[in-house]
Amino acid sequence: MPTRLAVEKTIKELLARYNAEDALLFGSYARGDETPESDIDVVVFGGDHFKKTDIFAFAEDLREALATNADVFEISEVDKGTPLYDSLMKEGIKIFR
């Protein structure tokens, strides 16, 4: 099970690799109640230089680097006012490139 520090470090590296602006870590890793069965939940803020198709490679690289499941979204995929969006704004931990 990766530590939160390892998760944040890997996300930072991937943000730089894919030229994305920043990300939000949310879910159990953000709350600090992750278990060996937990996946990693991330929303990427791609920005102007991030190709929308890079989200798939970003997700796969995150899964491979940390040897665990990960759910990765680009912020444009998340509708405001939904439970997912509300969860992001409430518990999300911002990770800067």
Task: Indicate residue ranges for each PLM-predicted region.
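Catalytic core of pol beta-like nucleotidyltransferases
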Residues: 1-22, 30-36, 47-97
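Short, conserved active-site loops that position catalytic residues or coordinate cofactors/metal ions
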Residues: 38-40
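Short hydrophobic/aromatic beta-strand micro-patches
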Residues: 43-45
